[in-house]
C-alpha cells in the first residue's frame, strides 16, 4: 500500500488523456470541429491536465473559478489553486462560438489538434486585476504578466478531452513520466516523502 499523500483534492488522479478506441474516435470527430488556437502556456496546461498533473481539474476554469483563484487562491469549491488555468480567444472568435458547442483545441505553434472541449461558459476578464492579484504587479517585464496581457479578451470554459501530450514522451523517453508513473515508482521504493523542485518559469 502506498505511503504517499493523496493527489491534490484528496481523490484519485484524473488524467484526461484518451487512449485506444476512444482516442481514435475523438481524433476523427475533432477534425470537423471549429478550431481554437492555444498559446504555448495553454498548450502546456492542456498537457498537464492530460497526464493528471493538474488533478482534479477537468478542463479550463469557469468565471467563478477564475475569480476565486484571483481573489483568494481558491476555486469555487474551496480547493486551493494559486494561478488561473484558462483558455482565451479574441472577441470575434468568441462571438462565433456558442455555449454548448464542441471545439477542437489546436497547438498554435504546430497546428496539431491536442484536444476537444465542450464550451460551458464564455466570459471577459480584467487582465490587470488578474496580474495584480496573482503576480502583484502589472509590469510587462514580468513573464507571467506578459503572458496574461497578451492573451485574448474572452475566456472559454468547459471540460476537455486530451488527444496528445505533444510528443514529449517520444522526445524524452524514460525522462518523461506522468504523475501515475512517478507515484508508482515512489511506492515501489517505499518512499513516503518526496522533495520536488519547480522551476520559476514553464
Predicted segment positions?
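Non-catalytic terminal extensions that flank enzyme cores
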Residues: 1-202
Amino acid at each position: 500500500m502506498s505511503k504517499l499523500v493523496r493527489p491534490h483534492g484528496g481523490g484519485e488522479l484524473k488524467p484526461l488523456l484518451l487512449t485506444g478506441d476512444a482516442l481514435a474516435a475523438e481524433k476523427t470527430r475533432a477534425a470537423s470541429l471549429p478550431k481554437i488556437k492555444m498559446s504555448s502556456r495553454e498548450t502546456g496546461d492542456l498537457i498537464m491536465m492530460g497526464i493528471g498533473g493538474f488533478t482534479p481539474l477537468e478542463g479550463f476554469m469557469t468565471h467563478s473559478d477564475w475569480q476565486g483563484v484571483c481573489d483568494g487562491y481558491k476555486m469555487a469549491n474551496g480547493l486551493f489553486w494559486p494561478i488561473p488555468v484558462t483558455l482565451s480567444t479574441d472577441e470575434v472568435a468568441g462571438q462565433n462560438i456558442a455555449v454548448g458547442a464542441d471545439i477542437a483545441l489546436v497547438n498554435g505553434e504546430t497546428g496539431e489538434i491536442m484536444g476537444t472541449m465542450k464550451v460551458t461558459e464564455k466570459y471577459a476578464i480584467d487582465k490587470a486585476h488578474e496580474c495584480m492579484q496573482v503576480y502583484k504587479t502589472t509590469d510587462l517585464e514580468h513573464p507571467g504578466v506578459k503572458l496574461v496581457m497578451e492573451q485574448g479578451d474572452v475566456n472559454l470554459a468547459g471540460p476537455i478531452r486530451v488527444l496528445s501530450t505533444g510528443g514529449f514522451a517520444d522526445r524524452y523517453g524514460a525522462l518523461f513520466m506522468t504523475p501515475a508513473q512517478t507515484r508508482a515508482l515512489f511506492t515501489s521504493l517505499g518512499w513516503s516523502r518526496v522533495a520536488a523542485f519547480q522551476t520559476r518559469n514553464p
